[in-house]
Structure formats: C-alpha cells, structure tokens
C-alpha cells in the first residue's frame, strides 16, 4: 500500500508540474492522456470537443490505432440519458462490461465501442457541455475505489481547464 501511495504521489506531482509548465497546450494534453493511460492501465485516451452547434469532434487520441473511436458524432446521438448518466458529480462516469451494469451503462459502452469506459465531461461558464475526456479498455480489472475515482475526477478537471482555454 505504501508503494502504491508513493507511486501515486510521484504521478500527481509530475502531472501537475506538466500542467503548470510552458509547453504547448496540445503537448500537455497528449502527454497527460498518455500518462493517465499508463498509470491506470487504459489502452485508449481521448478528448472530444464540440463545435458549439452540432458535432463532437475527436481532437486528441492515444492508442486508437484501430480507429474504433468515432472521428465525430452529432450531439443528438449522445442522448440526454447518456449525458445525465455521465454527469455524475465529483466523480467521472466509469463502467466495465465485467461489472453488473445498468442497460444505460451498457448502451454508453456500446456507443463508444469499448469494454470499459471512464469519462469526465467539461462545461462552459453557462453549464453547457463543450467536451469530454475519456479513457477506454482498461487492462486492469480491479474496480476503482471511490478515492481513486475522486482523484481522477480532480486530475481531469485540471486538464479540462487547459483544454477549454484553446476554444
């Protein structure tokens, strides 16, 4: 347990140093996605952002060599039920086909063509969803603890502020 906490501390320090560094926003985002994928054992990381009118566009991706993630999709394709389900306060949405899931969770997994999915939406100042950061196909089947989900929520919140700046 001590080794895991030490590893997490090093990861968090490195992550926050990067976000506070002088690198380009694109480099910060790509390296952050890569590090989160590595640390939490996800095969894919991605960022979708809206054009403000009709579509969500795939802006960054890690591990999507098979091109299974949609390059774009209409906002209306992500139903209100999906959006509400993924908009859990103080924690990201997480579902895995290995878990006992609701039909809505399975529908979200099917929509993204993945076996497991972690997503945190981000909003503009008016509360409108302008994008989301996600990770898919986790190799580790150990469920996340509430503390881990809250940590990920905070990390992705910091990263989402960097992403929103470029809009």
Task: Write out the residue ranges for each language-model feature.
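Signal-transmission linkers at sensory-effector interfaces
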Residues: 1-27, 38, 165
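Regulatory loop-to-helix N-cap segments in sensory/regulatory domains
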Residues: 2-3, 137-154, 162-166
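Amphipathic alpha-helical regulatory segments at dimerization interfaces
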Residues: 17-21, 30-39, 84-85, 108, ...
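Helix-loop-beta substructure at the N-terminus of cytosolic sensory domains
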Residues: 21-59, 67-69
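Acidic/proline- and glycine-rich, intrinsically disordered low-complexity segments
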Residues: 67-93
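Signal-transducing coupling segments at domain and membrane junctions
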Residues: 92-116, 137-138
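Sensory beta-strand/linker motifs that couple input domains to effectors
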Residues: 126-137, 161
